Structures are given as C-alpha cells and as structure tokens.
C-alpha cells in the first residue's frame, strides 16, 4: 500500500458562495464550492489575535452535487472528505494550473448545523427525527455503496437534513 500512497483531504469550513451546479452531457451533476477554513493564534510579539483564512475549491459529483445545490447556501458549514487534484490547461500559450478537492462517490460531504435562513424552523426537529434518520441513512448507504460517501446524500428528500447529519456525524466518532 505504501507504494501507491494516500491522497485524502478533510476539511471543515464554511461556504463563501452558494454552490454552482451544472450538468454534464451524460446527465451527471457537478457542483463547485468555495470553502473557507480559518485558523487563529496569538501573535507572540504584539499579543494580538491573528487569523488566517484559506479558500479551497471543492468539486462534488453525482448525488452529492445535487444535495449541495439543493440544501447548501453561502455561510453553511460543511465537512468534506475528498482527494486533492491539480489540473492544467493552456490559456493563449500560458500553462495555467488549478488545485481542487474532488469529492466523488467514495468521498463525503456532510452538512453541519443549519443554514442561516433555516435556523429557526429546523431547531426543534433534531431531537425527534435526527436519530431515526441517521440510522436509516446508515442502512441505505451500506446497501447502495461500499463507502460512506452516500450517507450525506440519503436524507435529500427531507428538509430537516442538516439536523439528521449532526447526529449521524456524532455517531461516527468511535469513542
């Protein structure tokens, strides 16, 4: 296994814009996300708090792209597992490069918390409906795919998806 290597990226961040969803000729959905991650620290010389934000280009495919387009909005917090990929193209004789995180069917996209506009409506629902949805998503995800990438896609029809995801995410922690 060490000869092949591991290419895995995990991000928890917030969307800078609404997802851009398009459909490729074979009918599959592709969504582009701009995800911001931030870290903060105290400057040793000045004592001031400092913050640095990194922007990540994330590309989702298939059902995950459709879910992102329907439920994610600017400011939403997401958990992403995917692969780092750099591609290049020629732009009038200049070679351009872009690095993206690809989330295919073996990857994961989970919505954390609720969208800012849905916050008041969705809050009471997780206690009643969150646990069963998480269990259903786990069962369905195992039946349809071998990976856990489909767990986030299963709750698509229910508007209370973000709350169900919170419980599903907590259940995945092994301790």
From Swiss-Prot:
This is Plasmid-derived single-stranded DNA-binding protein. Residues 115-133 have a biased composition (Low complexity). Residues 6-110 form the SSB domain. GO terms for cellular component: nucleoid. Residues 55-61 bind DNA. It comes from Escherichia coli. Residues 141-151 have a biased composition (Basic residues). One of its GO terms (biological process) is DNA replication.
């Amino acid at each position: 296994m060490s000869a092949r290597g591991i290419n895995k990226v995990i991000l928890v961040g917030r969307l800078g814009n609404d997802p851009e969803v398009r459909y490729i000729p074979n009918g599959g959905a592709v969504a582009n996300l701009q995800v911001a991650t931030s870290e903060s620290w105290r400057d040793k010389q000045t004592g001031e708090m400092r913050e640095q934000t990194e922007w990540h280009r994330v590309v989702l495919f298939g059902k995950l792209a459709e879910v992102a387009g329907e439920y994610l909005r600017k400011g939403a917090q997401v958990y992403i597992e995917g692969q780092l990929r750099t591609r290049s193209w020629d732009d009038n004789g200049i070679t351009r490069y872009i690095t993206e995180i690809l989330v295919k069917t073996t990857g994961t996209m989970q919505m954390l918390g609720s969208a800012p506009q849905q916050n008041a409506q969705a809050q009471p629902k997780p206690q009643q409906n969150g646990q069963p949805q998480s269990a259903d998503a786990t069962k369905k995800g195992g039946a349809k795919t071998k990976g856990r990438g489909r767990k986030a896609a299963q709750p698509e029809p229910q508007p209370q998806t973000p709350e169900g995801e919170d419980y599903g995410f907590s259940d995945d922690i092994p301790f």
